[in-house]
């Protein structure tokens, strides 16, 4: 957000007839198919979000950015508090929206590819936390706007989601994103004309979202997963690798 002064983790195949132990850290074939489906949805959702942002930007530019001035965040103005929900869609210049569009699409897609419904809940939370941080702590007589607070929210969510959901792939993605975009943390420090308060608020909201919206579904453990009985071919047929021993008449247990 920018402010301006105002005047276990291996893939284990499963099917209808068998379950392979993988524990809480495994990803089943069904999970993988669901991820692919949700990833397609995530791509189109983020493409739609960017399209909306750029349409708003064109209208805003044509109106000399009065939309930003009228619907951006004005710190500690009670009457402007609802503007925390409109400010992320508004920018101050073409360079401003261009700088936010790439990270917004990448982080938004990664935040959404495991479930678009959950993504919308995460988005609402980080909009509120980043907007409230800007409204409470940014300097007086300024207007704050821009999607960067939401970007930092997605960033925080992606970094911790894998740990809370216990998905190794998400943990790897979070680590890679943290390493590749570590320079972004410099924007959390105070800079003139930069709404770093919104960035911190978004980051905190994203981390909180990772915990609040973590996957609470029970996952099969290696101790409870059913065993797979295999058969190996031999001349004349197959010999099972496990058989039941016949009991003697009258036997009541192991001899």
Q: What are the language-model segments listed below?
A:
Residues 2-250:
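A detector for small-residue-rich transmembrane helices and their helix-helix packing motifs
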């Amino acid at each position: 957000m920018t402010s301006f002064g105002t005047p276990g983790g291996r893939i284990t195949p499963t099917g209808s007839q068998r379950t392979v132990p993988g524990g809480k850290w495994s990803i089943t074939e069904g999970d993988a198919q669901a991820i692919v489906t949700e990833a397609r949805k995530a791509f189109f959702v983020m493409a739609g979000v960017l399209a909306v942002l750029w349409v708003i930007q064109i209208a805003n530019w044509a109106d000399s950015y009065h939309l930003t001035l009228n619907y951006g965040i004005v710190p500690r103005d009670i009457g402007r508090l609802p503007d925390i929900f409109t400010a992320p869609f508004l920018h101050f210049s073409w360079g401003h929206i261009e700088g936010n569009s790439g990270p917004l699409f990448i982080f938004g897609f990664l935040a959404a590819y495991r479930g678009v419904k959950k993504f919308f809940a995460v988005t609402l939370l980080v909009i509120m936390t980043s907007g409230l941080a800007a409204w409470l702590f940014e300097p007086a007589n300024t207007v704050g706007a821009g999607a960067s607070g939401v970007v930092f929210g997605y960033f925080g969510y992606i970094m911790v989601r894998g740990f809370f959901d216990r998905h190794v792939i998400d943990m790897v993605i979070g680590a890679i994103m943290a390493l590749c975009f570590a320079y972004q943390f410099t924007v959390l420090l105070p800079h003139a004309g930069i709404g770093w308060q919104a960035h911190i608020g978004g980051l905190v909201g994203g981390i909180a979202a990772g915990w609040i919206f973590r996957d609470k579904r029970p996952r099969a453990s290696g101790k409870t997963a059913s065993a797979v009985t295999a058969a190996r071919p031999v001349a004349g047929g197959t010999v099972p690798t496990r058989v039941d021993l016949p009991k003697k008449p009258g036997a009541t247990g192991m001899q």
